[in-house]
Amino acid sequence: MYEHLPHAEGTVKQLQWIHHYLFQDVYDWAGQIRTIDMTKGGGEPFHPLEYMGVGIRYCEQTLKNDNLLQGLSIDEFISKLSVNYNNFNVLHPFREGNGRTQRVFWDMVARDAGYHFDWGLITQRVNDKASIQAKDTNDTKLLEDMFRIITKPLQVDLLAQQQFAHLVEEEYEYAPNVASVLQDKDYAAYKTRYGID
């Protein structure tokens, strides 16, 4: 797949295409937007299904306004990437496989912007911790630190040859593919907490 990646569009439709490609032999619903509200690892819930359309438009428009991260210095790229990466992570459009799908998606965005990621330089634990902190607190500092380690200009060779090497190095911080479906009472509590009508 990596040899023939199309140009980045920065859209959820492209995320759906990637997800379908990766998981078509695993899930009947590969490439389809989730139909349930979810949380993972006991943290804050992902974007509410009820407002998925708004979330999709926000993620796509923010990335588009940032010109798909093109024409930026490496520091600007990392800063804007961290915000956009967190936006799409919070959106969490699929029941499973969001992380792997996002890696391909962001690899495309990075390549078109003149960069690539050496994912094998970090562990799954680093990725989990940075993603969880950003999702739960909207603080992207750990994501920025992570991307500072793995972001390289295209002309610099990658050290780690396996794109997904960090997925198998050690235990997950939270069990993979384990998510909680929000019950009505949980969803009502979050709606009250965040003032959602």
Set out the residue ranges of the language-model regions.
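FIC/Doc superfamily catalytic core
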Residues: 1-96, 100-197
